[in-house]
Structures are given as structure tokens and as C-alpha cells.
Amino acid sequence: MFKILEKLTAKNKKQDDIRMPSHLSAAEQKQVQTVIDRARGDRTIPHSAQESIPFQRMFPDGICRVTDNYYTKTIQFQDINYQLAQQEDQTAIFEEWCSFLNFFDSSIRFELSFMNMATDASNFEKMVRIPYQKDHFNPVRTEYSTMLRRQLAQGNNGLTKTKYLTFGIEAESMKQAKPRLIHIEIDLMNNFKRLGVRAKLLNGKERLHLMHDMFHMGDHDRFNFDWKWLPESGLSVKDFIAPTGFAFPKNRIFQMGGMYGSMSYLQITASDLSDQLLKDFLDMESSQIVTMHIQSVDQNKAIKSIKHTITELDRSKIEEQKKAVRSGYDMDIIPSDLATYGKDAKALLKELQSQNERMFLLTFLVMNTGETEQELETNVFQASSIAQKYNCNLRRLDFQQEQGLMSCLPLAQNLIEIQRSMTTSSTAIFVPFTTQELFQTGKEALYYGLNALSNNLIMVDRKKLKNPNGLILGTPGSGKSFSAKREIANAFLVTDDDVIVCDPEAEYTALVKKFEGQVIKISPSSTQYINPMDINANYSEEDNPIALKADFILSLCELIVGGKEGLQPVEKTVIDRCVHQIYQTHFENPVPENMPVLQDLYEALLRQDEKEAHHVATALEIYVTGSLNLFNHRTNVDINNRLVCYDIKELGKQLKKIGMLVVQDQVWGRVTANRNAGKATRYYMDEFHLLLKEEQTAAYSVEIWKRFRKWGGIPTGITQNVKDLLSSREVTNIFENSDFIYMLNQAAGDRQILADQLNISPHQLSYVTHSGEGEGLLFYGNVILPFVDRFPTDLELYRIMTTKLTEVQEAKEA
């Protein structure tokens, strides 16, 4: 029928009377006549661009009166990771989306709008530019901002992609429409929540802003509007959103402001549709709008209509059989199309009656744009190629460009009478979800690479997570240490946070020195000391910091004295008693020179009567007066610098475990002091698996993972030995309390264990299988994204951060 309609419309546009083909029903003839009347457009030509916009009034609460008795609302919804999800998760999303569609009855019209709109590149550049601060590092900030702009240019962040659902109902008045619209809105928000999709209702100003941006795609005109301006100016809301003009000079293109556009509809001819079709349309890197108008058909009417169709087909079948008998043919031989249609109609009837399917009428529209006619035609050709790839056709809306354009507005007002009947499952195949983006615009959002699926910048703020604790995992050469250094540098330049690094391989010295940080070299030959007995009044959230410090000293003594069985109960008792005694003296006059050292504990133990106290004192002796007395000194370095690195590379096997535990306690002291000052503390632990090897350091690490969040601490474990990490008894606690994981290339044995631990799909796992340097998966809360970080190698920061031996040597020689 629609082919006939197109021919009639084109051929007879200037004729007043059209003879309808006799085989069309009265309803079909009326439908054709309506479209032709619209196509003529010579009886109701709008006098202005404002008049062309087909709504009557926008209310501040977001309700729009489109016609005398038709009211609509718009919801903006975010994306979820459908394309990257496991097969069972994709099935679950699809089934939930089917239920979502089935919510709409025939009294609710709705429209899905997918808008890809170019935005001013300078706006994005402003978002990624790092503001200057009053320190010596603004040249580095400039360099880092330049790097971000270069990365931005590689992606298509200049294209803003948004998704909307607009729904509308018929009502006699605003008073009657409002409560029902609110009720539908609440149900829809709950349905989105079940899908795991974040959604928000647009108010009137936001809806106007959206239409303004759509009408001003090519000129980047700013939206300036306030409700209070209307009475004073005598203007209508349309004056604030309309372009300079609309022009429809040809039958298949239009001009809107300074931009060319073309409206097309998707002719669905494929027997089977793919869930990739909509995704491919939305992946086009040009300004465009994809719109789906969907109208649910009353179930009884749909069933009745199909039954009528079956009856008509049966009648035709009988006629064909009679014809066959008269002609002397076998009456069972009937046209194959007739048999196929009959079979399909019966299958459809069964679906509607017993398989929770509904019938929908779908109009699928695509608006392509271009700065020139040539660019427009190129974009239309690309969209047509996508349709043909899936055995469908993209047809231009000849003589209906204006109606098509206005049907793309988020008003749920369909002015195009080209509809395709589809069941729930067929309609749901246009799954409106592809891949989630992680581009946060807060001032503390940090750079983590480009989204491997969309090539857009990944910028996130770990502080926005419920649990900002993190892990950086990767095989040697995958970019693990570089990623940690990049985050450290970024955090130092962007935030006011303090940064502490536990560095077992002396890899971070150059970076720390670049930012005038403090490198504390802890080794038997060093003259830099940190005191494991350091304490401050904020050490515990309770009123008694000594009790928590005693717990740490017990862990320390466990490493020194414990052996396989650990400390005995009596030994724990005497240690606890002595700790309270020596700190009681300190808190009576808390000056630095009164801070206890290990020798004070050693002497206090010797003063006790129990033989167990003397046993512990004897074990401590080598760390107090012997050759391992490194930790029997008061702290003599600046541990309050914004950036502190504890270099423990030269600690021998005997001291390394103790050194790591002491560093952890120093960090805890810093975190507690910073919390009191309202400051966050980032703590990076390289070779993190070593901390989980020993029971005491593992238990302390788990405590850090559990308690840091409340105190403004953001710990990050970095390791290449994933097997050792995963073999720890504490690993479950670590993973359960980590909402941020930066996973680079993984060894074959580790991949499957991680997949089981983190519920990673085989497709997701492919991004950490034989992946290149700086490539992998980012876990941010519930979002999993593949990333690629091609950090420019010509920057000074790169030379400081690289761990490649040849590049490190070149940097030293330079």
C-alpha cells in the first residue's frame, strides 16, 4: 500500500482530485488521502518557524499540551552495558525490555528518541582542562591538559549521545491528565530501575532546551530562557527554541537554520531482525536523530483483526481450491504465499493468545544532517548501507520532510502514517542499550584511557563510588605500574588529596621527585627513620587511640616473636599492658621528644615479672640494640609532605615484612590526621600480593580495605602476581570491598580465576587476553568497560613515568 502511496503522492501532488485504486479499502483510501493532503501542504502553510513546531503549551513541571486533548512527558534514560554483557545477562535484559514494552496499553502513545548531536568542542576542552593552582606545577598541568585534548580528538566526545522516552495520553483537561501522567511516570521509573537503568524526568525548561538543541544542531546557538521572561516580553516558549527558519525546497531534503537535513523511514523487510541494527545506527559519527514511535494495539482488537485475516486467507484458499478443481488440478496445490501467510497468521494468533505477546504499530524514523548537501547525502548513504546490511531499506520521506522532522521532536506526536505491525519480541529487538560511557565532569574526575567500544574519553572520580578502594592488575609489561603512576600524577595535579606510595621496587622515585615529594628510603644503611610507635590523638575513631595502637604493636610482635603458633595469650597480655604504660606517659605530655620508641617497649617488658615478658623482650632485642635496629628511632623525615614514597627495596627478607607493616601503620596515622582536617588520602601499594602473604600484614590490609572509606582513605593494590593474590585467604574480602579494578592483560591461568571471582563473560575476558600495553577492562561500580590508553610518548611526564628499561636509561642520560 505504501509504495502506491509514494507514487500517488509524487505524481499527483499538484492535482486536486485523485482517483483511488479500486482494490483499496475505504480505510486505506482515507489513509492515502490524509497523507496526500499533508504532502500538498498548500492549504496550511505555517507563517513562521514557530508555527511549524507542533505543540500548544509547555508547562514548567514538564507536561506539554501537544493538541487540545493530548498531553505528554519526557524521561531521559542512561545507557547500560548490553553489548558487552554475558549471553544470559543479554537474555535477561531483553526479557525485561519486553516486559517494559508490554506495560504500555493502547491508551498510551510513546516515542523513543536517540539523539546524537555535535557540541562545541571548546566545551569539552573546558571540562578536561586542569585549573591552575598556587604551586610550581602549572607547566605540568598544562602538559597534562594538552594530552587530554589530544586524546579527546581521537574519540568522538564532540558528539553527545542521549536517549529519551516520551509518553502521552488523551485527556479532556490538564487537571484530568496530570495525575494519570504522574502515575505512568512512577511506573516507568520503576521499570527502568528493574533494568538497572538510571532515568530522570525532564522539567519544562529541560524539554525546551532539548528541542532548542535539536533545532540548532548546526549553529551552536546558546539556549537562554527563563519562565519569568514570558509575561514581560509577550513571547511564547517557541520563540526561544525555534531556528532562524525552516525551508523545504526539495521533496527529500530540508534546511533548518544553517544545516541541511533529510528524513527517512526504515522499511522493515527482513524476516529476522538483529539487535545490532539500532546499535549500528547509533554508532554513526554524525549528528542525527533516530526516533521510534510505538503504539500498542488493544489486545482484543489485535486478536480479532488476526482472526479476520485468517478467515480471509481461508476464503482465498477455498477460492483457489475451487479454481484448481475447475481447471482439473489437484486441489491441495495452492499458491505458496497463501500457505505461508496462513501459517504465519496462525502462529501470530497463538503468540498473542498464549505467549505474553502484544501487538504494536511501529514507525521508525531517521533524521540525517550535514553542513552541506554533499555531506548530508554521504550520511544518508551510510545509514542506508546499515539498513541494507540487515535486509531492510531506508526510504526517504518524499514530500513529507516537514512532517517527518516534527515527528522527531520528543513530543510523542507521530505525523507519519507509515506503520509496521510487530509483536512485543519483534519490537524489543531494537534494544535501546549499547555501551555505557564513563565521562564524569566533576573537578576531581581523573583520566583512565579511551572507551574501546566508542573511543570516548573515560573520566571518573573514584570518590563517587560507594567503596573507592581499588586494584590494578596486570602481567609484567602490560602497563600496570605506568597506570598507577598516571593516576598518581593526575590526582596530584587535579585534587588536594595527599598521596602515599609503598614502593618495594624503587620505581616511583623519579615521579615523586618531579612533584617535590618526600622519598623515604628505609634500609639498614639509611639515615632516614620512621618510628613504628608514632601515634596521634585521632588514631582511633573511639576515644581510646591506645587500644588500636596496641592492636598494631601486637601484629608487629607477632611477626617478630610469633612463629607458627603466634603469640601466646600471656605474651599478648604483657605486651598490651606495657603499651598502655608507655603511651600513658606520652599523652600526659604529648611532645615529639616524648614519643615512645621500640626501646621503651623493650624496657617496659623487662620490668615485668612474667617470664613470657622476658621472652618477648629477648626476641625484640635484635630490633632494639642489635643489627636490625632500623625501627628503634624517632621519625626524622617529613612524613607530612603531600606526596610521600616509602622505598623499601633494600630491606632484607627479615625486615621487609616488618617494614611493610610499619608503613601501613604510618599511612593509617596520616589518614586519621587528614580525616580530622577534611582531606582525602590516596595510598598505593605496589607488589600488593606480598602484603597478603603474611597473616599479620594480610589481616592489616583487610582492615585498611574495610575501614579506610569512612576515614577518607582511598587504597589501591597493584600487582602482577595475580595467582599469589588470589591464593590468599583474604582475597574475597579485598574484592568484595573494591568498587574499582583496573585490569590489564592477564596470564591464561589467572584469567579464569578472575572470571569466576568477578563474573566476567568470555567476551569481556577477550579484552585482557593477549592484549597490548595499556589495554584491558575497567570495573567502576557496576560498570565494566574495555579501555585503551595510548599515552603520548613525547611528553616529559611519560619519560618520568615509564618503566621500560631503554626509555628509563634514555631519560637518565638526557
Predicted features, each with a name:
Residues 480:
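Conserved lysine of the Walker
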Residues 1-435:
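Extended, folded cores of ATP/NTP-driven motor/assembly subunits in large transport
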Residues 80, 87-106, 113, 117, ...:
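P-loop NTPase motor domains
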Residues 490-500:
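Post-Walker A helix-loop "phosphate-sensing" segment adjacent to the P-loop in P-loop NTPases
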